Amino acid sequence: MRVENNNVSGQNLDPEQIDLIDLLVQLWRGKMTIIISVIVAIVLAIGYLVVAKEKWTSTAIVTQPDVGQIAGYNNAINVIYGSAAPKVSEIQSILIGRFSTTFSALAETLDNQEEPEKLTIEPTVKNQSLPLAVSYVGQSPEAAQKQLAQYIQQVDDQVNDELEKDLKDNIALRMKNLQDSLKTQEVVAQEQKELRIRQIQEALQYANQAQVTKPQIQQTQDVTQDTMFLLGSDALESMVKHEASRPLVFSSTYYQTRQNLLDIESLKVDDLDIHAYRYVMKPTLPIRRDSPKKAITLILAVLLGGMVGAGIVLGRNALRNYNAK
């Protein structure tokens, strides 16, 4: 009874188990094909690793410039605009904004080249405008770090040149406005002087007609245009000569305008050293390569080679079985 049960048990093996064992047997018999396939895949992977361009990413973090970095620019703005000049914090925001815009434009230009270069700028913290992370992908760690530093400096120099040009244009416009204001005030002062002389001459004419030669009043501060002739012709003639030789009289606004003009003329824009950013972290020297990944590439090569080899073995055996039938 025990022998019969064993026979029955052996005859009732699971067909799926038999198929799996048969599959493993086929793969084992064709192991040389699989090994050769894996070796070929590894060789191809090594060839790819040798030929493929390496990618290394250097990153830097920048933020708005310090007050000391824009001291000269801030002083020039204050001289030009006076009380209407923007605050230091506003200037800092403007400068880093121009840096970001110019950097983005450069990144777009590099991306559209015949051989594109990957340069990026983005906030380091989501929903916060500052600080900014800038990065560059190069073919070696040193090249990526060096090129990123050069592009940052290039953008900073470009912003500096643009700001200096804007300052020169604003200075020229402001000087013209101040000069026009001075001319207007000088014309008004000259007209006031001429009016004063005509008034005295008219009073002198009345005094001569009334034959008033000596002052007829004691309190000169009470004299009006209608009563000026009472000062007498002698005094009025002296007043005419005095007013004619007297320099123009200007208000304090005139002298303040002139002082502003002199201050602006003394500005030396070319000597300003304007920086639109400040480093939070200088360009890094990358220690991990972005691509190609050696370990991952070789592992994938082994897996792919094994799969191809197994496919060849199973396909060949299936074709033999089909032909045998």
Swiss-Prot record:
InterPro entries named among the record's database cross-references: Bact_polysacc_biosynth/exp, LPS_length_determ_N_term
Its membrane topology: Multi-pass membrane protein
One Pfam family here: Wzz
Main location: membrane
GO BP annotations, alphabetical order: lipopolysaccharide biosynthetic process
Transmembrane parts of this sequence: 32-52, 295-315
Pathway(s) served: Bacterial outer membrane biogenesis; lipopolysaccharide biosynthesis
GO molecular function terms listed in the Swiss-Prot or TrEMBL record: protein tyrosine kinase activity
Signal peptide (from-to): none
Keywords: Cell inner membrane, Cell membrane, Lipopolysaccharide biosynthesis, Membrane, Transmembrane, Transmembrane helix
Localization, UniProt: Cell inner membrane
Periplasmic domain ranges by topology: 53-294
Cytoplasmic side: 1-31, 316-325
One annotated Gene Ontology cellular component of this protein: plasma membrane
NCBIfam families to which the protein is assigned, alphabetical: PRK15471.1 (NF012015)
Function: Confers a modal distribution of chain length on the O-antigen component of lipopolysaccharide (LPS). Gives rise to a reduced number of short chain molecules and increases in numbers of longer molecules, with a modal value of 13 (in strain O111/M92) and of 17 (in strain K12).
UniProt family annotation: Belongs to the WzzB/Cld/Rol family.
Annotated protein name in UniProt: Chain length determinant protein
Organism (species): Escherichia coli
Gene: wzzB
